[in-house]
Amino acid sequence: MSEKTVKYEVKGPLAVLTLNRPNKLNAINTKMMADINKAMNQAEEDIKIRAIVLQAEGKSFSAGFDLDDEVWEAKGEGELRATLEQDFDLIMRFWDSPKPTVSAVQGYCLGGGMEMALACDLTVAAENALFGEPEVSIASGVVALLLPWFTGPKLAKELLLTGDTKVPAQRIYEMGLINRVVAL
């Protein structure tokens, strides 16, 4: 039986997408990417849906891209480039959506998970949320393109050059990267 990596619910005018790999801190694998795209298509095509909410099951929003996923075992530059383009396209789905997107973040929100959350029109984080970009120690991706749009170059570089994975929600709010910090 195939794992249901994304739950899709309609709540009035909202489509609620729930990342559903809590045992892996909602790390984004190939299956989850396909499931997110399918859910986004469904929400965007439904004329009754006015906005899309992205949230996660469990104690963390997302630990980022699942490095145990076989897609990261690229055999050459071409395959790695294709993987990075697929990751970019996934994140930009939220940025480019014709419907407003809102991310609700709790716990760890790292790497690709942080990029996906920040690509939403609005981001609300629980007080326990911790943000970071650990992949900057190996490579830089979408985040290097997105961060300067949200915050000035100095603050973007602070996140990109440190690779800190435990930046509290309040600091991220002060940097202008999220809209609200709320009690859990």
Regions found by a protein language model. Give the residues of each.
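Conserved CoA-thioester-binding segment of acyl-CoA-metabolizing enzymes
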Residues: 1-57
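Hydrophobic/aromatic residues within transmembrane alpha-helices
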Residues: 17, 54, 66, 116-118, ...
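Conserved phosphate-binding and hydrolysis motifs of nucleotide-dependent enzymes
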Residues: 20, 26, 64-66, 107, ...
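A short, glycine- and basic residue-enriched loop/turn
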Residues: 22-25, 59, 64, 128-130
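Residues at secondary-structure transition points
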Residues: 23, 27, 34, 78-88, ...
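Glycine- (often His-adjacent) and acidic-residue-rich active-site loop
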Residues: 56-93
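Crotonase-fold acyl-CoA enzyme core
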Residues: 93-184
